[in-house]
Amino acid sequence: MLSSQTSSIFTVSRLNQTVRLLLEQEMGQVWISGEISNFTQPASGHWYFTLKDDTAQVRCAMFRNSNRRVTFRPQHGQQVLVRANITLYEPRGDYQVIAESMQPAGEGLLQQKYEQLKAKLQAEGLFDQQHKQPLPSPAHCVGVITSKTGAALHDILHVLKRRDPSLPVIIYPTAVQGDDAPGQIVRAIELANARGECDVLIVGRGGGSLEDLWSFNDERVARAIFASRIPVVSAVGHETDVTIADFVADLRAPTPSAAAEIVSRNQQELLRQIQSAQQRLGMAMDYYLANRSRRFTQIFHRLQQQHPQLRLARQQTALERLRQRMGFALEARIKQATQRQQRVSQRLSQQNPQPRIHRAQSRIQQLEYRLTENIRSRLSEQRERFGNAVTHLEAVSPLATLARGYTVSTTTDGKVLKKIKQVNAGDIMTTRLEDGWLESEVKSVTPGT
């Protein structure tokens, strides 16, 4: 019989391990309410204590990285609410609780309800970003749902008056604390939606304890905010206070004053933006005008470079350069002849026979005279040819022709008119005179006889 049950026999270690795994996996994380006793804190910083009620008790441990977040010092006999994991200390087989968080019993129960409602609404999708409505920009009317005697209303109105004095504000007074507060807040939200006077709502109150803010952790308020067709900004308590309303609202503001900042326009900032825009517009206009001025100057210079007078000036410059080159050529010829004469004289002087010298001198004088006359004749001839070339160039210049009373006519596409077959009656032609242009219409065309 013993051998048939061998597979069901546990060692002590295996038994404790199995029980620990069952406790951790099946129980998970739980909330435990009880009274603290035997509280100790050794040098390690961990807390060890017992939680008990009238009929039972359980050993608990809370490690340093968890207990440092507890905002109060636990006392013997104090009622607390602990969020913990159930486990077993295997070496001794001791069943114990490992605490993760601790709160005084009153706030602890509220916190437990808060966590349960938060998980429920989150599972339903009320916190999803896809349901968030965008705030109007700018807002044309702001609705405020809060106590008419609270500091929150004073803070909101003060900020709105400072930032945007012309912004209309409608107050929906309601209780924000007490048993009647959730119902009044819901009715105020529904009334604002029914009247449709505002395009954004601020729902909130000033700071307080968890009990003071509990109206904004009410499920009815959360669902009313979610159902609102008007975007809702939650502004409950201080920045560290987070309520269910904050998760459901379209936007959470850390304080009522911050909510007023969010929904209003800063008129001074708006004025600065307008002035900045005007300055940028002025700079853009200055740049545009300067750019167009540069473009005009470029076109003007290009037209000047294509003017007929400028072309004539370039031709005159080229003619002057040609004249200078001809002068330089003549001077070079004279210099070469002089040098040749000097060389001949030198050779003759070296031979020394007097008769030959006299004859050579006579011959040289004749050659010199003839050379001089020849050079003068050639120079005169070149000057005459140069003068004729200048006269010819001036004679064939279009401006000279126009000065003699002639005109040049062109068609509208710029072609010079040479024959009557290039135009027909009714065509427009342009005629160039010495001092300007004429535009005329062809009345008739008569062939020459």
From Swiss-Prot:
Q: Provide the top EC class.
A: hydrolase
Q: What is its EC number?
A: 3.1.11.6
Q: Where in the cell is it found?
A: Cytoplasm
| GO biological-process terms attached to the record | DNA catabolic process
- Pfam families, alphabetized: Exonuc_VII_L, tRNA_anti_2
Please list the reactions this protein catalyses.
Answer: Exonucleolytic cleavage in either 5'- to 3'- or 3'- to 5'-direction to yield nucleoside 5'-phosphates
Q: Which InterPro entries match?
A: Exonuc_VII_L, Exonuc_VII_lsu_C, OB-fold_nuc-bd_dom
Highest taxon of the lineage:
Bacteria
List keywords of the entry alphabetically: Cytoplasm, Exonuclease, Hydrolase, Nuclease
A GO molecular function assigned to this protein is: exodeoxyribonuclease VII activity
Q: Which GO terms describe its cellular component?
A: cytoplasm; exodeoxyribonuclease VII complex
Residues annotated as signal peptide: none
Self-association and partners: Heterooligomer composed of large and small subunits.
Give the protein's biological function.
Answer: Bidirectionally degrades single-stranded DNA into large acid-insoluble oligonucleotides, which are then degraded further into small acid-soluble oligonucleotides.
HAMAP family, alphabetized: Exonuc_7_L (MF_00378)
Q: Which family does the entry's similarity section mention?
A: Belongs to the XseA family.
What's the protein called, per UniProt? Exodeoxyribonuclease 7 large subunit
Report the gene name: xseA
